[in-house]
């Protein structure tokens, strides 16, 4: 009772608006893999046996954005996207505009974004969601909107519930191709920021693993914490959509210099697709994802699933994570793997390459334990170009 009274006071003092608590959620599910179109043809040319997955690393920033644009430009049935961050900058607007164009062609687009770093007004999100083929959902939004004071107050009162964030990052098109990895959507993830850029890696995937990824997306999309974008502002109207689309077009025109390496309109990417069969690695793939946490706190920890997969490794286990803080259970699993002759390698960020010093400070406490478990531990340099220059000199 006291918490409710305090929350009401914060709302009044902050001059806040609040979200309706229980909006209508339409349940939807993944569409079967497309049987025609450029993406289906490209996937079929890989000639993958049943149960097999093809994977290609996307380490270069421009290539990572190229492939996202290429998949969207050739989509014919569905696009399912899930990200922690989607920024309203050049990269974010370029890709968002292409998604709108795909929806115009009749492609069903579902976009799920976490609320914590949401970059866009509630009203605009609702307007975009009025498109008949385009729906946005916001993961675990705070009820208090348009007020920093109110938002902080709500977070303090309901920390446990609002601290449950969605860091997942996936991009599935026509249920034939998927992109997974460390990149969110924004300039720093694609080498376009004038301040700093992140070094990330994605995997382009085709084959047996893609329907698994789509089914995992459905669990988040239909979860009780996924809030319908159309309900973010009930007054939003589809009549506002053309004007919002013009704003996107004007933004892209004004920032064309930053985006000079990318086509501003849909184009044919078949020359890019032709190179794929020679570049992919073929094998068995596992997709791991924690389940969406419900309000009652039920959850399945990703580290437990990693332990399970690690137990199946026979020769080598490689873990790559910018933020690596192992549990005791994972350390025991690593030691057990090493004792059976499995080579375990771990790559994480150094202090200089990490954008969260608090996380790195906590990780440092585990260095000796990781090495004692028998793993090879590597930290990514913040200045790899300097090292390369020293070698070439």
Give the positions of each predicted feature.
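Bacterial N-terminal signal peptides
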Residues: 4-14
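Charged, low-complexity intrinsically disordered terminal segments
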Residues: 16-169, 173-393
């Amino acid at each position: 009772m006291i918490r409710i009274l305090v929350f009401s006071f914060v709302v009044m003092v902050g001059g806040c608006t609040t979200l309706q608590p229980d909006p209508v959620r339409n349940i939807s599910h993944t569409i079967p893999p497309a049987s025609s179109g450029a993406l289906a043809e490209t996937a079929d040319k890989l000639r993958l046996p049943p149960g097999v997955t093809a994977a290609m690393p996307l380490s270069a920033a421009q290539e990572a954005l190229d492939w996202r644009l290429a998949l969207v430009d050739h989509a014919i049935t569905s696009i399912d996207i899930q990200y922690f961050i989607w920024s309203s900058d050049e990269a974010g607007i370029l890709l968002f505009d292409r998604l709108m164009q795909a929806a115009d062609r009749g492609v069903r687009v579902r976009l799920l974004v976490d609320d914590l770093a949401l970059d866009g007004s509630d009203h605009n999100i609702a307007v975009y969601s009025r498109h008949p083929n385009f729906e946005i959902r916001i993961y675990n939004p705070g009820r208090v909107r348009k007020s920093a004071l109110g938002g902080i107050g709500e977070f303090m009162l309901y920390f446990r519930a609002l601290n449950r964030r969605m860091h997942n990052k996936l991009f599935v098109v026509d249920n034939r191709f998927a992109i997974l990895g460390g990149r969110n959507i924004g300039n720093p993830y694609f080498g376009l920021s004038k301040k700093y850029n992140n070094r990330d890696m994605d995997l382009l995937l085709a084959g047996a693993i893609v329907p698994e990824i789509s089914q995992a997306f459905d669990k988040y999309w239909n979860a009780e914490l996924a809030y319908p974008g159309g309900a973010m502002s009930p007054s939003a109207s589809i009549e506002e959509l053309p004007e919002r689309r013009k704003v996107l077009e004007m933004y892209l025109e004004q920032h064309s210099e930053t985006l000079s390496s990318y086509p501003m309109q849909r184009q044919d990417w078949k020359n890019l697709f032709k190179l794929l069969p020679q570049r992919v690695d073929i094998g068995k793939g596992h997709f791991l994802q924690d389940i969406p946490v419900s309000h009652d706190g039920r959850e399945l920890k990703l580290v437990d699933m990693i332990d399970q997969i690690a137990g199946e490794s026979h020769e080598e286990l490689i873990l790559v994570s910018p933020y690596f803080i192992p549990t005791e259970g994972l350390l025991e699993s690593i030691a057990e793997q090493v004792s059976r002759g499995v080579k375990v390698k771990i790559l994480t960020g150094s202090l200089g390459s990490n954008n969260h010093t608090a996380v790195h400070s906590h990780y440092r406490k585990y260095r000796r334990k990781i090495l004692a478990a028998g793993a090879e531990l590597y930290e990514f340099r913040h200045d790899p170009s300097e090292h390369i220059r020293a070698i070439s000199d």
